[in-house]
Design a protein with these regions (language model features):
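A general marker of short, structured functional hotspots
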Residues: 1, 43-46
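N-terminal "cap/leader" segments of large eukaryotic alpha-helical scaffolds
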Residues: 1-12
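Structural detector for internal amphipathic alpha-helices that build alpha-solenoid repeat scaffolds
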Residues: 7, 16-28, 36-39, 46-60, ...
């Protein structure tokens, strides 16, 4: 796991630092880690959606397809993944 991923999932991280960490994942094209953030149920929905949108930015079509079909994540996230792919 990258340092940026670890920052994104830590419990006591400021909103700004968490968003910055997700931005770094997007910039580096870390699609697997972004998809994992979307699946992380302990993470606020705002950040899960941000990671989902980041997948679209870094051409994560394969991950978006997988997330759209994944029944273990919230239906709203699945619908958004389907829209983005």
């Amino acid at each position: 796991m990258s340092t940026h991923f670890q920052t994104a999932v830590k419990k006591r991280v400021s909103h700004t630092h968490r968003r910055d960490a997700i931005d770094r994942l997007i910039e580096r094209g870390e699609r697997t880690n972004l998809a994992l953030l979307v699946r992380t149920s302990g993470l606020d929905g705002e950040f899960r959606r941000y990671a989902l949108n980041g997948l679209a930015e870094c051409n994560g079509r394969e991950q978006l397809e997988e997330l759209a079909d994944n029944t273990t994540i919230e239906p709203s996230l699945r619908r958004r993944a389907d829209d983005l792919r």
